[in-house]
Amino acid sequence: MAPAPAVLTRLLCAGVRRWPGFLQKAIPGPAEQNGRKVTGAPVPAVSEPQDGDDFQSRILDTPLQHSDFFNVKELFSVKSLFEARVHLGHKAGCRHRFMEPYIFGNRLGQDIIDLDQTALNLQLALNFTAHVAYRKGIILFVSRNRQFSHLIETTAQACGEYAHTRYFKGGLLTNAQLLFGPSVRLPDLIIFLHTLNNVFEPHVAVRDAAKMNIPTVGIVDTNCNPCLITYPIPGNDDSPQAIQLFCKLFRTTINRAKEKRRQMEALHRLQSPKGSEGSGTSPVPDKSHSP
């Protein structure tokens, strides 16, 4: 049955305000101002431009023109990965079928991870992490393993980022505006040191991050599913030596990217006309987030 004319008029005018006595021109409601809708997607990690396009081209676009602007390739080698036991996987019976392309072979019933692929994926993950930290993005370390909780929290604190090593309630990312308010900002990158929880099930945050289009970096063992991880790093996630190596690499990469950002901003202030005229002025303080 077709709706009544009055009901149809209300449906067509939903979300639109009209001023009585003036021209019947629709004015967009609060949810449609500026052509954008209020969503729970994370805010881009690009800071507001300073001095127009010059700041954009010199500071923000320069790292994108180099394949390894932060020299993350020199932080590790295949030998260092081997010495940290990154190549050791689980038993062949626990193997996930999507991890088969990253497995080098099997020895005495234990899967061996191909370290050449691990080094390639690790370089891509560290490079992406450095670019996010360079643009002052929020990085969240996530793990559910109690054995490495203190190490992960210390790593996040050392590089000025955040960590979540306790129980992760489902909906913290998808319903963040309802739980924390409309002004909450979601992380720009989530680093999973373990993609499984205590009962060897996929971590809830992996699924929620995929729903919210939040990029993820994750250490995936031979019993993990790498499909929902944006930058999977095949490697051992149970050995203390391996986790210490990964934490050291992430901490060094983030600190290096932040230091590079401070150097680029200082160089830009010195080269700009305003900086040369007022050399006696105090430098602009770093407004990056602090945990």
UniProtKB/Swiss-Prot annotation:
GO terms for biological process: mitochondrial ribosome assembly; mitochondrial translation. The gene is Mrps2. Required for mitoribosome formation and stability, and mitochondrial translation. The keyword Transport does not apply. Transmembrane segments: none annotated. Belongs to the universal ribosomal protein uS2 family. Keywords: Mitochondrion, Ribonucleoprotein, Ribosomal protein. This is Small ribosomal subunit protein uS2m. Component of the mitochondrial ribosome small subunit (28S) which comprises a 12S rRNA and about 30 distinct proteins.
